Amino acid sequence: DPEIEEILSLKSPRTAIEKRIADLSYGIKLNQLVYDRARDGKPISLFSVRKAPELNKLFYGKDINKFIEEYERLESLNLYTSQIDARDFLKMFAMEKTETSSYYVVNIDEMNTNTSYLDEISQSNICVEFMTPTLALSSSEKDHPAIGICVLGNINMSEVSIDELPAVTKFMVETQTMLALRQNHPTSQANAFVRGYRDIGIGISNQANWVAKLGYKYGEPEVLNTLDEWMEHFAYGLISASNELVDTFGVAPLFHKTNWKTTMPLDRYNKNVDSICSRKPSLDWDELRD
């Protein structure tokens, strides 16, 4: 966005009061191109969506290479509004985030590739925990799942052992699903989303305490294999429990709009993890595919 520098400063205490929006929290969407330009010491070009509508569309797509190709084509034609040094931009963002504590960053290319949704995602909830496809509301499509709904739960990692994970994850999935299906949201589009996808998000907390109980300091590489083992059992338990819900509720109506039939998290994780974690998967993931 050509106004990104002004947008970043809108919450700053140094900004004039008449322009400040202290009560509004929002996120900034980036993709790999920004980081690559910063690494290489190059500028980023700022385009208006009016002059580059196709670029804006590709920004939310699932193929960043197509975005970069169009981006560089428009750059070669000098169609950008202005340019800013990529490193200066990231420094400015980091400074404003540090001072205001209310900016959230969304890596939109990662959001659209490391996801189970087949439709493109353009936004998330404010704290970037839950990313779903959304559409502009239309009164003529009252039953269209246009509003993403967060149905979130949490497991205290330091209080649950690997042996307890199957029972705990099963309980969490069943409880959150039941709660979701009992909810009645103000709009039919939100209800259509919840009932169509039956999506829930289960996270973890207290990882630092879990690490301390093992006798390590947070961030030490020695704990990574143990963490990987715990997280594999955590993910496996959640997906296994979700499969069992089919016996109760049947297949989710919008299951066909996801890639769960062919793709597991194990298939799409960032392979750079293999350079810091030597452990290999130990559970029967193929059984879940069936």
Question: Locations of the language-model features?
Answer:
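Polar, glycine-rich mid-to-C-terminal structural blocks
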Residues: 9, 13, 18, 22-100, ...
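Secondary-structure capping and boundary motifs in well-ordered enzyme cores
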Residues: 2-3, 26, 85, 123, ...
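Short acidic, glycine/serine/threonine-rich loops at helix termini
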Residues: 3-12, 19-20, 39, 58-59, ...
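Generic secondary-structure signature for well-ordered alpha-helical cores
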Residues: 9-16, 35-43, 91-102, 157, ...
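Inter-helical turn/loop segments and adjacent helix faces that build the functional surface
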Residues: 14-20, 45, 75-83, 158-164, ...
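Short coil/turn segments at secondary-structure boundaries
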Residues: 2, 19-25, 46-52, 104-111, ...
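Function-dense linear segments that define catalytic or interfacial modules
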Residues: 96-194, 204-211
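Internal maturation/activation junctions in enzymes
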Residues: 169-191, 216-290
